[in-house]
Structures are given as structure tokens and as C-alpha cells.
Amino acid sequence: ADEFPDLGGASDIFQTLRAVLFEANLGEVYDRLGDRRDALLKDTVRWNVELARRLTAADVGRALRGRGALQERVRLFFERFDLIALPTVQVLPFPVELDWVHEIDGVPMSNYLEWMRSCTDISVTGCPAISVPFGFAPVDDGAADGADVPVGLQLVAAPGHELLLLQVAHALDGDGWLTRRAPVDTVAR
């Protein structure tokens, strides 16, 4: 089916709650490092801690309420469907020298999480998810020396349906994916 649950707000919810977790787990380390933090902490770690420190209790409350509403929309979706299938990430594998993808198809990413929204948005739902290899896509930008690169298919099930998810993933994994090639027009760049 061409239907998909409404994940509106998922990106902001994810970023807010992730930042709070970074502050809770690494805020003390961030403070102790003082002037050395730029040299010793990855910029994305600093970004999360600093984001958390700019948030208000109202911001966190909105994120928690938003997550509850989003999870309810997804629960209702799963009353009609068994699984969601979507690309694991929005881009093909990129050079290891890049920390993260800064632009997709001419659209700038505002932070290091946006290039993987198809994963982070699903994380907010609280649903079990798995990524399975699902063939290869040709790359014509010279970055991969003309070799095809692997693509993943993300499968998502309703909470409590982990067995179904694993059964479908196992069936797909044993289905000769190594010989499949994805059509270029179905893979976001």
C-alpha cells in the first residue's frame, strides 16, 4: 500500500530527547573538560549537550507529549498494516572521510541527524525496527570507483511484534539479496 503513518514532529522530538540524554550522560564530563572539550569531545557530542542546555522544561514537555501523540498515530496505523518498509537511510554510502552528509539532492542538512531521518523518525515511534541488506545501487559520481554500493531496507513492526519482524527479515535475508540490483530511481541520493 502507498500509505504511511504520520510522523509529523518526529525529527524535533528526537533531537530534543536525544539532547536531554546526552546532557544527562555527558554533561558532567563536558563541564569537567572546560577549555579542553573542543579537543577531546566530538563536535556532535558538544552540539547535543549545548542544545539540551538551551532547552526549557516546556520544550521537553512538548517533546514528551508529541512522542505520545506520534506513538498513538503509529499504533492506529498498525491496526491496518503488519509492517512498514522504507529505506534505511536517505543516501547511498558516502566516503568515510565525511562525518555526516551535509546536503541531499541540493537540500542542505541543518544538523548531523537530518541525513538519517528515516531511522531517527522511526526511533521516536518506539517500534521495533531492523535493517536488512536489500541489493545494490550503481554510483556514477566517481566516489565509489564505479562499483555498486549496498542499500538497506528498514522494516518496522508494531510494539510487541518483534517475532514477526525477525521472521520477515530472515526471509528477506535468505532471498538472494546479493544478486539483486536496485533501480536507480528508487534510491535517494
Role assignments for model-derived ranges:
Residues L7-G8, V91-F94:
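Short, active-site-adjacent cap segments at secondary-structure transitions
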Residues L113-T125:
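Hydrophobic alpha-helical segments in the ANL/AMP-binding
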